[in-house]
């Protein structure tokens, strides 16, 4: 009888040890996961900052280009199209995609009229906010600020 008892104790010890080990492992994994998330956030922030700066330079270049010609830089080109805006982007050698917007067909005619320059600018910025919602944070604030003006532009069109 005492022999079986000692056997039980011996068997129980490694089981308990394994169990505690299994409990500790997820805590370490969670800590590592949190560290990784922080690193990812930092990376995303710096990427967004780089993207924002690139986006501003592209935007300036596009507004200066009345003819609506596309500027190509970098190794590749990225394109997307929504109902109101043609979005184009450049993929630089390090793989960061720089996006910029061009007005869709109907808007190109309106953009050529310089008399309504400010109105055209504000409505174009709002479209940029829509097109870039997932990638470009700085345009959202601009589109929200100009929301009042955009409403007037929409009324003026109809």
Curated annotation (Swiss-Prot):
TM ranges: none
Lineage, uppermost ranks: Eukaryota, Fungi, Fungi incertae sedis, Microsporidia, Unikaryonidae
Residue spans of biased composition, Polar residues class: 1-21, 128-137
Biased amino acid composition, Basic and acidic residues: 51-68, 107-127, 149-158
Domain of life: Eukaryota
Disulfide bonds: none
Location of the region described as Disordered in the Swiss-Prot/TrEMBL record: 1-89, 107-158
Protein name in UniProt: Uncharacterized protein ECU01_0010/ECU01_1600/ECU04_0010
């Amino acid at each position: 009888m005492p022999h079986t008892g000692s056997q039980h104790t011996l068997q129980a010890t490694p089981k308990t040890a394994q169990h505690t080990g299994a409990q500790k492992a997820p805590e370490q994994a969670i800590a590592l996961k949190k560290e990784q998330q922080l690193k990812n956030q930092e990376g995303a922030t710096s990427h967004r900052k780089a993207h924002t700066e690139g986006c501003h330079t592209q935007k300036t270049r596009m507004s200066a280009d009345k003819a609506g010609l596309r500027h190509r830089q970098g190794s590749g080109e990225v394109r997307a199209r929504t109902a109101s805006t043609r979005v184009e982007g450049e993929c630089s050698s390090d793989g960061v995609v720089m996006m910029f917007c061009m007005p869709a067909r109907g808007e190109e005619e309106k953009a050529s009229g310089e008399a309504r320059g400010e109105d055209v600018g504000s409505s174009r910025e709002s479209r940029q906010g829509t097109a870039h919602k997932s990638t470009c944070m700085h345009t959202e604030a601009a589109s929200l600020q100009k929301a009042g003006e955009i409403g007037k532009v929409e009324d003026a069109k109809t």
